[in-house]
Amino acid sequence: GKKCSCDPLNGYAEIQVKTCTLDISFKPVFKSHMSVDGGIYYTYGPFLLALKIDENCSVDTKEKRQTADFPAYNIYPASPWNYAVSGWEAPEIIMNESSEKPMWSYVPFEIKIKARVLENWELVRIKRAEKEFENGEGIDEKQVECGASVVDEDNLVTPKIPSADFVKENLGEEREITLVPYGCTNIRLTVFPKYFIK
């Protein structure tokens, strides 16, 4: 094979070849994007990225619907997650090799960027019972036949993206963080608060 030039039109390049074996390589680009709520999220080629967070995982003993074969888990962050970014970070891209097949147990690449700790931006506890169906019990008859019960939720969730003033007042030290493909995470922080560079 030989290299040839092409002029992409609207992001597409037409390649005409005779019958042959062909490998095509595309170089993914690391990009930051502004979310509708004013935060920043990142992509690398077709991959949406999320913060790599250590996990504290335990079986939820209060969940009545779990079985030994299909347990319910509580998964909480075991490493810092409260970071703000500028959207102008220079990435360090690390490609990971694996001989595993299937390859689901490893992260194919990691991207390291600089971020700032955002003090006082903490998880929020939401406690509620589902009451969404007409019978007022939160479940319908078919679900009862299958053994369902009212869902009592007691969740820790990521708070909304804070205001620019909150970010400015609570901006902490700079640290290196690691981004990985969204699908390689169980706990997901994808949209980061934005801080402005002076």
Model-based region annotation:
Residues 13-26:
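Short, well-structured beta-strand segments within conserved domains
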